[in-house]
């Protein structure tokens, strides 16, 4: 079953005759539990695609469908709520809230929704990511790799339809990158979590179940 679909997705900037086609008719789908890597060089359109898939930026035309819901048909409030409940994000720069400790950062999406934290699931995530002894730490007391582990936990805590990871190891050294990528792969398998990862690195992309290549705003492979 498809968790995410993009249908003739286009994102244009500027006006004729100086139009930049950041995305130019992108069509693909991601199945439940699949780990997909979208690979492209700088300027290929891969980050624009992630922003469209995550409902962070509207397309010029076309559709993004997540769990059978068309993002373009939602107003801002509906989209914010839907995104919080159904889409987890892992960014290159972690995006942790500096005044919250590790535990508070992880459970923030659940508490923003007024829901009760699933403690059993939380403990499973924390154990898998090796964060048991870090829950009371503040982000500035963590290494880059540890901060990214917290970001992974936060992305998983709502059991989202899909996790979108944008160059998740871009700020990490090679050893820490390998550890973090291994954890993303493992959490995808362990929790049957659908993941789409954006990267420019072919070696990183090979960890995925499937690779999609994007060039000049179009899928080429």
Residue spans of the language-model regions?
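Generic C-terminal helix-cap and adjacent flexible tail
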Residues: 220-221
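ABC family nucleotide-binding domain
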Residues: 3-207, 211-214
